[in-house]
Curated annotation (Swiss-Prot):
<dbReference type="GO" id="GO:0005737">
    <property type="term" value="C:cytoplasm"/>
</dbReference>
<keyword id="KW-0028">Amino-acid biosynthesis</keyword>
<dbReference type="GO" id="GO:0004401">
    <property type="term" value="F:histidinol-phosphatase activity"/>
</dbReference>
<dbReference type="Pfam" id="PF02811">
    <property type="entry name" value="PHP"/>
</dbReference>
<dbReference type="InterPro" id="IPR010140">
    <property type="entry name" value="Histidinol_P_phosphatase_HisJ"/>
</dbReference>
<dbReference type="InterPro" id="IPR004013">
    <property type="entry name" value="PHP_dom"/>
</dbReference>
<protein>
    <recommendedName>
        <fullName>Probable histidinol-phosphatase</fullName>
        <ecNumber>3.1.3.15</ecNumber>
    </recommendedName>
</protein>
<comment type="similarity">
    <text>Belongs to the PHP hydrolase family. HisK subfamily.</text>
</comment>
<comment type="pathway">
    <text>Amino-acid biosynthesis; L-histidine biosynthesis; L-histidine from 5-phospho-alpha-D-ribose 1-diphosphate: step 8/9.</text>
</comment>
<dbReference type="GO" id="GO:0000105">
    <property type="term" value="P:L-histidine biosynthetic process"/>
</dbReference>
<keyword id="KW-0368">Histidine biosynthesis</keyword>
<dbReference type="InterPro" id="IPR016195">
    <property type="entry name" value="Pol/histidinol_Pase-like"/>
</dbReference>
<keyword id="KW-0378">Hydrolase</keyword>
Length: 255
C-alpha cells in the first residue's frame, strides 16, 4: 500500500484537520497515512509549532494500525540539536521526518528574508543550513520538502534550478545517501508541470549518487489534500528509478 507519509492534524499549530477526517480520507483514496505533527523548538513565536507529545500518543494510540501510523516532523536546528535528539530517543514514533522551516531564525514564509538579499545568496544559505542541520540530526528517517523555500521565495522566479546550486545540493544528497536517510517527494507543488521538470534533476542526481528510496508526502493540513498529486510523484519516482517506501516502528517498508 502506498502511504501519504506527511500530514498534520490538530496537534499542529497550522492544521484544522482532525484525525478522523485524515483516516477517512486515506481510506477513500486507498492510502495509508502517517501523522507527522510539527515540532519546531526554535520557532520565533513562543508556543507555536510545538505540541504535547505525551497527549498525542495518549489520544492517538487507539487509531494506530497498519494503515495509520504516528510520526513527527522535527524542525531541525543546530541550536536545538540536543533537545531534538532527546525527543527522538524518548518517544516511539513510527517515523521521524526532518525539515528546514527557518533561515537565520526567520520563518521561510516571511517576505523580509527575500527583500533583504538576492536569490542566489538566500538559496545558497538555505542549502548550507540544510546540510549543517542534517549533520547534527543523522537519526531522521527522511528529509522533507527539499524545495520548501520555493513555496514562499518572493522573487520573480523562486524555483530551484539544480544546475545553479548543484555544488550545494550535491553535498546534501551525498550526506543523506551516506547516512541512509531517505528523501521525500513532497507533492504540494506537483500540480505544475514546470515544478516537476525543475525537481526531476535533483531526484535523478540523488539516484545517481546511490539513493534508492523516497517517501511521498502531501504535507496536508486539510482532508481534501491528502494524496494530492500522488500520480505525478509516483511517476517522478519511477522515472528516477526510486522506490517509494514508508516507515513503521522506524523500520523502512516498501509501499
Amino acid at each position: 500500500m502506498v502511504f501519504d507519509t506527511h500530514l498534520h492534524t490538530l496537534f499542529s499549530t497550522d492544521s484544522k484537520m482532525n484525525i478522523e477526517e485524515a483516516i477517512d480520507a486515506g481510506e477513500k483514496k486507498n492510502l495509508g497515512i502517517i501523522i507527522t505533527e510539527h515540532i519546531d523548538l526554535n520557532y520565533p513565536v513562543k508556543g507555536e509549532f510545538v505540541f504535547d507529545i505525551d497527549k498525542y500518543f495518549k489520544e492517538y494510540n487507539k487509531y494506530r494500525s497498519n494503515k495509520v501510523l504516528l510520526g513527527v516532523e522535527i524542525g531541525m536546528g543546530e541550536e536545538i540539536k540536543e533537545q531534538n535528539k532527546s525527543i527522538n530517543d524518548k518517544y516511539e514514533f513510527d517515523y521521524v521526518l526532518g525539515s528546514i522551516h527557518l533561515l537565520n531564525g526567520l520563518d521561510l514564509y516571511e517576505k523580509t528574508i527575500y527583500k533583504s538579499s538576492p536569490k542566489k545568496e538566500v538559496f545558497e544559505m538555505y542549502f548550507k543550513t540544510m546540510l549543517a542541520c542534517l549533520r547534527c540530526h543523522e537519526y531522521i528517517d527522511s528529509l522533507a520538502h527539499i524545495d520548501y523555500i520555493s513555496r514562499y521565495a518572493a522573487y520573480h522566479d523562486g524555483e530551484i534550478y539544480y544546475n545553479e546550486y548543484s555544488d550545494y545540493i550535491d553535498e546534501v544528497l551525498k550526506f543523506i545517501v551516506d547516512r541512509e536517510i531517505v528523501i521525500e517527494i513532497n507533492t504540494r507543488r506537483l500540480n505544475k508541470k514546470e515544478v516537476c521538470e525543475n525537481l526531476m534533476p535533483i531526484y535523478k542526481r540523488y539516484s545517481e549518487l546511490g539513493g534508492r528510496f523516497v517517501t511521498i508526502g502531501s504535507d496536508s493540513h486539510y482532508k481534501d489534500s491528502i494524496g494530492l498529486n500522488f500520480k505525478n510523484a509516483l511517476k517522478m519516482a519511477e522515472n528516477c528509478n526510486l522506490k517509494p517506501v514508508f516507515f513503521e516502528k522506524r523500520l523502512m517498508k516498501y509501499a
